[in-house]
Amino acid sequence: MKAFTQHNGLVAPLDRANVDTDQIIPKQFLKSIKRTGFGPNLFDEWRYLDVGQPYQDNSKRPLNHDFVLNNARYQGASVLLARENFGCGSSREHAPWALEEYGFCAIIAPSYADIFFNNSFKNGLLPIILAEDDVDQLFKQVEASPGYQLRIDLQAQTVTRPDGEVLSFEIDAFRKHCLLNGLDDIGLTLMDADAIASFEGKHRASQPWLFRD
């Protein structure tokens, strides 16, 4: 997993509350357990005017030009600004996969659904919680200022606006450590590879009848 330390990124405002995981990545695209291939279908039912299907050539599909990610001023956005209860609905790890593959490194919202929140950290996507008043102000500034960027400093736990205003956010110390060091569950396990190998060796020696060579 790629480490997250600091990030300067263009902000895309998704001004909708209670965005659920089926809206983030619709169910028909969940047939793969690979982590790649979901970005082109992020928010599929909002980005396109037709019904998308797996492995379809999206370049030939009609775009919904009223949707924020189809607006030229937000092309290349890497920070998603959202409303409360983002990521609600069914549990699917494909949701943070799709957001990350599209190009988002962080999300800013007043609140998240618990499962989505946890899945985001496990996949290197930083979900930042800010007060609703601060989020409201960010929406106003983003919509009024083309090219609006934020600076996110995970070590300092701050979001800095273009006007220099600094917003602080809280994050669990363990999750922060994992993101700063690029550690997912597999990476954490591999840190104890020597201890695991030592245990397996002792276990095999003490109870050889449990193993078949």
UniProtKB/Swiss-Prot annotation:
Protein's name in the database = 3-isopropylmalate dehydratase small subunit
Q: Which InterPro entries match?
A: 3-IsopropMal_deHydase_ssu (IPR004431), Aconitase/3IPM_dehydase_swvl (IPR015928), AconitaseA/IPMdHydase_ssu_swvl (IPR000573), IPMI_Swivel (IPR033940), LeuD (IPR050075)
Q: What are the EC numbers? A: 4.2.1.33
Q: Please indicate if the UniProt record lists Amino-acid biosynthesis as a keyword.
A: yes
User: Annotated pathway, please?
Assistant: Amino-acid biosynthesis; L-leucine biosynthesis; L-leucine from 3-methyl-2-oxobutanoate: step 2/4
EC category name: lyase
| Primary gene name | leuD
**Top-level taxon of origin:** Bacteria
**Keywords, ordered alphabetically:** Amino-acid biosynthesis, Branched-chain amino acid biosynthesis, Leucine biosynthesis, Lyase
Q: What is the lineage of its organism?
A: Bacteria, Pseudomonadati, Pseudomonadota, Gammaproteobacteria, Pseudomonadales
Q: Which Pfam families match?
A: Aconitase_C
